[in-house]
A protein has these predicted regions:
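Short hydrophobic/aromatic segments of transmembrane alpha-helices and their interfaces
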Residues: 1-2, 50, 75
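N-terminal helix-turn-helix DNA-binding core of bacterial DNA-binding proteins
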Residues: 5-11, 17-57, 83-90
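Beta-hairpin "wing" of winged helix-turn-helix
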Residues: 34, 70-79, 86
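Core alpha-helical elements of the protein kinase catalytic domain
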Residues: 23, 66-67
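Alpha-helical residues within the helix-turn-helix
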Residues: 52, 63, 69-70
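Conserved segment of winged-helix/HTH DNA-binding domains
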Residues: 2, 6, 27-30, 84-113
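Short leucine-rich amphipathic alpha-helices used at interfaces
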Residues: 1-3, 38-39, 69-70
Length: 113
């Protein structure tokens, strides 16, 4: 993980709204109802459900989701007329390992290999 990608991830996570959404996406069955289209885990959560749960407008939620996607913390998938989002668990694990190494004063460079 390079400095630029780390900075994008931290910037995306600096918003309480984006952080909350990401935490919900990590446990979609606990936070969202079953969907007519797409599996909550395999396909992701429909942006409509995210919008309803967070209580913001759809354009605002889409802007937040774009930031998370640009930081490679979520992926998106179109099913019919809707966009579904799911977390990039591998990227989140890399970020977590990077933080642990930094906290332990270990080599951060070695944590991304």
């Amino acid at each position: 993980m390079n400095d630029e990608s780390s900075a994008k991830m931290f910037a995306a996570l600096s918003s309480p709204v984006r952080l909350r959404i990401l935490l919900w996406l990590l446990e979609p069955r606990a936070h969202f109802p079953e969907q007519q289209d797409g599996d909550l885990v395999d396909d992701g959560v429909c942006v409509g459900f995210i919008t309803e749960k967070i209580g913001l407008t759809q354009p605002t939620v889409s802007a937040h989701m774009k930031k998370l996607a640009e930081a490679e913390l979520v992926t998106s998938k179109r099913i019919g007329n809707w966009i579904f989002y799911r977390p990039q668990r591998k990227k989140l694990k890399i970020l977590g390992n990077w933080l642990l190494c930094a906290a332990d004063n270990s080599s951060v460079e070695n944590s991304t290999k």
